[in-house]
Amino acid sequence: GYLGGYAAPALAYGAAPAVAYAAPAAYAPAALTSQSSNILRSYGNLGQVSTYTKTVDTPYSSVTKSDVRVSNDAIAHVAAPALAYAAPAAYAAPAYYH
């Protein structure tokens, strides 16, 4: 038989669920990345050009970083000689007498 009035249901239909469901991490959009680096040296390793590039692409944005460096040791050594010679005073600047 019937035992008294209605009992309160164990689950109220209007209540918010205790667990909120979110998309699993596997469904997140993928990001594509790439990077490269190169070094080009001259004959005798007197100068070099080095490049580095990194790219990150997502469905929402794209970022690229680049770095290019040029060095030339030959110019550095020629620009600052260890011993400098000066012209004799007679040839340095002509003097005019009136």
Swiss-Prot record:
Record keyword Acyltransferase present: no
Native source organism of the sequence? Locusta migratoria (Migratory locust)
Instruction: Show the disulfide pairing.
Output: none
Q: What is known of its domains?
A: The tetrapeptide (A-A-P-[AV]) repeats found throughout the protein are also present in many proteins constituting the protective envelope of other species.
> Origin, by domain of life?
Eukaryota
Q: Pfam families of this UniProt entry?
A: Cuticle_3 (PF11018)
This protein's UniProt keywords? Cuticle, Repeat
Is Repeat there in the keyword field? Answer: yes
Lineage at the top is:
Eukaryota, Metazoa, Ecdysozoa, Arthropoda, Hexapoda
Q: What's a Gene Ontology MF term here? A: structural constituent of cuticle
sequence repeat residue intervals: 7-10, 15-18, 22-25, 79-82, 86-89, 92-95
Q: Please describe what this protein does.
A: Component of the cuticle of migratory locust which contains more than 100 different structural proteins.
Protein known as: Cuticle protein 67, isoform A
